[in-house]
Regions:
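N-terminal lobe/hinge region of extracytoplasmic solute-binding protein
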Residues: 36-86, 115, 177-178
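Gly/Pro-rich hinge or "lid" segments in bacterial periplasmic/extracellular proteins
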Residues: 70-73, 152-213, 219-222, 327-328, ...
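Surface-exposed binding/hinge segments that line
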Residues: 83, 126-169
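Ligand-site clamp/hinge motif
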Residues: 200-245, 373-375
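Periplasmic-binding protein-like
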Residues: 245, 269, 273-312, 358-359, ...
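Structural transition elements
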Residues: 302-336, 353-357
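Extracytoplasmic/peripheral linker and loop segments enriched in polar/acidic and small residues
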Residues: 373-384, 411-480, 506
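Long beta-strand-rich cores associated with HINT superfamily self-processing modules
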Residues: 478-506
């Protein structure tokens, strides 16, 4: 009699079940927070992008020149000041800080780090951006002057990314030495990572914790159960079907924000998705309301344009329905592209995150209605990342947030001139789009920047380097006696690990 119960019905019911509290809260290690991660990080190499769980761990161990406060405002970090210096240069004055080996953080370490990221054989996420540096001057140990090849208003925001931490210049490749609030203590691949407080951290009184034990719970329902049972203090990626029950639990607290989104990526190195008409056909084939219902239990909204939030000064309401659901138009575009009968293609997603799997299944059904048979591939997250980086798919499901709340934060998702990454389409390069992104980051006048990005968005909607699907609520949940940790607003939610330095438990 249970054979016809859907996954959605099951998880919604399971989320509402009362879990017996364990004795773990009574046997906590004082001052140690247990964090339930959504996956074991594929890599915690400092300059690579391997997902949010990895980013959270990197924010425990490392710090960059810049970062964000709890309100999402850009602030100096290892730098104590940042100022524009002429048309193309930025001047940073370093604070007195130490790496985990006791060595001081110096301008030479900053110069070495940025040169490694920009190196020809680098696989760093920000490699292309750092290749825009003309020279790095280090007049003394605590002063860095970065001269760009062209004016770059966005450099301080790039340097706030958890993909751009400063590493000790004599580090071995397998053991990068950071300057963050915690030091790597132990790890068991696939299971846990432990860090302990760094006694010489440059902020007085921080970190407030003695350590953090990060445990991987790939199953989202087990992750919630662990929190409800008291086995962990804090979890990321609260499943949407569990948000209501967690919000009502007097022992727990939910901290959620809107900002991340789901989207589609394409392999543009071969037919059929090297044709923008086919990509736009896919865009018009998707009934986005069904994704919001199936994957996010209504805790989200449709996204039929580039992911620029309506809270942004750069939002253009005239374009908000550009990729609206219109299956007749989708079929017309397929016919114009010479594929009136449709085709078969591979569709990469992952079974490890329910929102990726559920969103992909909705898209698969919608595509079938216009003649596209999309064959799903649902590996674990680490495999999904590797396949995406290598372009081993025709269509792929993506889920992320922009790098920051500036429209240039979308560049890493839509600029095909950048090195391959699972977060952007493979081999979809639109020269004019790249040119406009460069123009936007070179323009310091707000009105002129706004005009550039409006034109850029219109071009991106026509070329469809990615296709937006749905905004989603992104939540962390914690026990009531956890304080100091905050979910940063909007696109910065994945930077929230920066606040672990202020977290306390008990």
């Amino acid at each position: 009699m249970f054979a016809n119960i859907s996954r959605r019905t099951f998880v919604a019911g399971a989320a509402a079940l009362p879990f017996i509290r364990s004795a773990r809260a009574a046997t906590r290690t004082p001052g140690v927070l247990t964090f339930g991660l959504s996956s074991y990080p594929p890599s915690i190499q400092p300059w690579q992008n391997t997902g949010t769980a990895a980013g959270t761990v990197k924010l425990m161990i490392h710090r960059g020149l810049m970062s964000y406060d709890v309100a999402g405002k850009l602030r100096p970090e290892l730098a104590e000041s940042c100022a524009q210096d002429g048309a193309t240069a930025w001047l940073f004055r370093l604070r007195q800080a130490s790496f985990h080996n006791g060595e001081p953080v110096t301008s030479a370490d900053v110069k070495w780090t940025l040169e490694q990221i920009a190196a020809e054989k680098s696989t760093a996420y920000f490699r292309a951006e750092m290749q825009g540096i003309d020279k790095i001057e280090t007049p003394d140990d605590r002063t860095v002057r970065i001269v760009m090849r062209q004016p770059t208003v966005t450099l301080p925001q790039w340097l706030a990314s958890f993909h751009l931490p400063i590493v000790w210049r004599k580090s071995e490749a397998a053991q990068p030495v950071g300057a963050g609030p915690f030091v790597l203590k132990a790890q068991e691949r696939g299971v846990f990572i432990e860090v302990e407080a760094f006694a010489k951290y440059y902020k007085p009184g921080m970190p407030r914790l003695k350590g953090i034990r990060a445990i991987a719970y790939a199953d989202e329902n087990l992750r919630v159960a662990a929190l409800q049972a008291g086995d962990v203090d804090l979890i990321e990626y609260v499943p949407w079907q569990s948000m209501e029950s967690i919000g009502k639990d007097e022992a727990l607290r939910l901290d959620a924000t809107d900002g991340p989104f789901m989207y589609l990526l394409f392999n543009g190195t071969k037919p059929p998705f090297n044709d923008a008409r086919v990509r736009r056909a896919v865009a018009h084939a998707v009934k986005r309301e069904d994704i919001v219902k199936a994957a996010f239990f209504g805790r989200g909204s449709t996204l039929a344009h580039l992911p620029i939030t309506d809270r942004s000064d750069f939002y253009n309401g005239e374009l908000k329905d550009s990729w609206r659901y219109d299956p007749a138009l989708a079929r017309k575009l397929l016919a114009e592209a010479g594929r009136p009968e449709g085709f078969t293609c591979s569709f990469l997603s992952t079974a490890q995150y329910g929102m990726h799997k559920d969103s992909a299944e909705v898209v698969q059904q919608n595509l079938a209605a216009i003649g596209i048979k999309a064959e799903l591939n649902l590996p674990d997250w680490a495999t999904r990342v590797n396949l995406g980086n290598r372009g081993q798919y025709d269509i792929a499901m993506g889920g992320t947030a922009a790098d920051n709340n500036d429209p240039d934060g979308l560049a890493n998702l839509i600029d095909g001139s950048l090195s391959p990454s699972y977060v952007r389409s493979f081999g979809v390069w639109i020269a004019k789009l790249e040119e406009m992104l460069r123009a936007g980051r070179a323009e310091f006048d707000p009105a002129r920047r706004k005009a550039i990005y409006r034109e850029m968005e219109a071009l991106a909607l026509a070329e469809a380097p990615i296709v937006g699907l749905a905004w989603r609520s992104q939540g962390y949940a914690m026990r009531k006696d956890v304080s100091g940790f905050r979910n940063l607003p909007g696109a910065l939610t994945f930077q929230s690990g920066i606040t672990l330095e202020e977290a306390q438990v008990g």
